[in-house]
Amino acid sequence: LSRAPEFITLSDAAARAVAGAQSRHAALIEDAFDVLVETPGGGVSLTGDSKGRAQAKKAVQAIAERADQGLDIGEADVRVAIGNARSGAAGPLSANGGALPVGLRG
């Protein structure tokens, strides 16, 4: 399988959101998809097998979309993006535009 890096061009705000404080968000993505996430400037570089890169790319794009809307990205947002990428869910991190769905307990 190809382990060549794939570069995704992102805004500075989106790249910072994907990396997270102390690279915490990047580490979550790396662990979830067995890829290497690097932020050399101007975007994100993903290195790993093709399936891992494809899923990580979906998560990165979902996080970047929210960051570009001016929304703060927290660890919960990253975990939701990872879950959606794994399950093949498309679109924003949740149907109502929030980070997490609201349960019956509100």
Q: Which role does the model predict for each range below?
A:
Residues 24, 31-34, 61-65:
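Short, intrinsically disordered, mixed-charge
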Residues 1-17:
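Short glycine-/aliphatic-rich beta-strand segments at the starts of folded cytosolic domains
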Residues 38-99:
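Interdomain "pre-motor" coupling segment immediately N-terminal to P-loop NTPase/helicase cores
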Residues 13-31:
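Short amphipathic alpha-helix segments
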Residues 9, 20, 50:
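Conserved residues at beta->alpha junctions
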Residues 27, 33-36, 40-42:
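Compact, well-ordered interaction domains used in eukaryotic information-processing assemblies
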Residues 99-106:
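Dynamic helix-loop-helix/coil hinge segments at AAA+ ATPase domain boundaries and subdomain interfaces
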Residues 1-3, 30, 95:
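A generic structural signal for short, non-catalytic loop/turn and secondary-structure boundary residues
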